[in-house]
């Protein structure tokens, strides 16, 4: 149709969310919904400041953009640190998020804590592991997650516009978040370790061995192998199902953990739109960039042209 927005996907105007792709509905969790919305307001600034009190030089941060595989990573690291079986309660109590870190597990050298954070780089972060995942897979995972929890009610095209503007959550657009870490004062030093989620998935034992070395841990290789085996995505899903507070499927946090799912889930128009915003950061991280591969399109798997997450 002439003049049609290529990122519209034909959604009727009668069922159209607002400009941010968000339609008011009864949320799955009123508290979670309120907390998410407040994170996108100016109240976030003093709240972040308060959350970063009580940090110590021996603390190490496990930082990531949401939906980058940090839950799986935390489970394995918890078993590496403690030698104990990782369950949701134990992991959440041991490797706590920033703001809840006071009572976190002190299992690092010099009595340090491993603290999780979804924030952009901050000067308080003196030493960190930055877990990064292909932004296209992050977007697909976040779309599935926020749609299931009724935080977002638009289609995938509307979601991508909102996601790339940083309006899905209070953590800034994916590409800006990544750049804040890659361009930080601790980048290119021994105080920052950038880890690709895809590398961890391909060779988890080697990847977590390197992380343990970065943390200054002397760990038996058998413990690392056991931690990886005990926390496959399939086993984590079973652990989550056993959690009493996970009453319904849409409350599930552990999903597929796919790698390069974007190749079959995103259309060429959607890929081009993403790369207009984040292409340079994707390339900087070493991820394949669609616009740079037009001439070599026959040398890689063909993109399946689909407009929805099926």
Predicted regions and their residues:
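C-terminal anion-handling pockets and recognition modules
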Residues: 225-232, 271
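Short, glycine/acidic-rich hinge or "gate" loops at secondary-structure transitions
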Residues: 222-227, 291-295
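PAPS/PAP-binding and catalytic site of the sulfotransferase fold
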Residues: 69-83, 194-219, 227, 235, ...
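PAPS-dependent sulfotransferase catalytic domain
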Residues: 2-195, 247-248, 253-310
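Short acidic/His-enriched helical or mixed secondary-structure segments at domain edges of catalytic enzymes
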Residues: 229-250
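A short coil-to-beta-strand element that immediately follows conserved catalytic motifs
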Residues: 88-91, 220-226
